[in-house]
Design a protein with these regions (language model features):
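Solvent-exposed, charged helical/coil patches
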Residues: 1-36, 98-99
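Histidine- and/or cysteine-centered catalytic micro-motif in compact active-site loops
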Residues: 9, 44, 76
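Generic secretory/membrane-interface signal
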Residues: 15, 54, 66, 98, ...
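Conserved catalytic cores of phosphodiester-cleaving nucleases, focusing on short active-site segments
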Residues: 16, 59-77, 91
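Active-site metal-binding core of divalent-cation-utilizing nuclease and nuclease-like domains
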Residues: 20-68, 109-117
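Nucleic-acid nuclease catalytic cores
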Residues: 73-117
Length: 117
């Protein structure tokens, strides 16, 4: 997953900060395609209660090969908080994927935040 960090650093350095989240997702997709990763964007994450689907959320990117991992992007003005970590934890549980990465292209201080768990 070190390669994902490298992609994030490249995007941060070359594209910069201040764009909406979907711009960074698209930039990451360019890197993933160029490296022949198997992935999908906007993956449906079902919310199940007592075997009934109540609704769904969407994970930004799910990588299936060469490893399984959920990438969740943010472009917010504040640092990542427990709220975002909880969101990614739910996605990991509901999609049965062990690895996840939170990526924040912080618009306030032009700093990249990268949390792998």
């Amino acid at each position: 997953m070190e390669k994902i960090k490298e992609f994030c650093d490249t995007i941060s350095n070359e594209l910069g900060h201040g764009y909406k989240e979907n711009i960074y997702v698209q930039a990451m997709c360019i890197h993933l395609r160029n490296e022949n990763y198997l992935f999908r964007t906007e993956v449906i994450v079902p919310i199940i209660y007592k075997e009934i689907q109540l609704g769904y959320e969407r994970a930004d990117i799910v990588i299936y090969h060469p490893f399984k991992c959920i990438l969740e992007f943010k472009a917010q003005n504040q640092a990542l908080s427990n709220k975002e970590k909880i969101q990614l934890s739910k996605y990991k549980k509901n999609l049965n994927i062990d690895n996840g990465i939170l990526i924040n292209f912080n618009n306030n201080n032009n700093k990249l935040e990268y949390i792998e768990f």
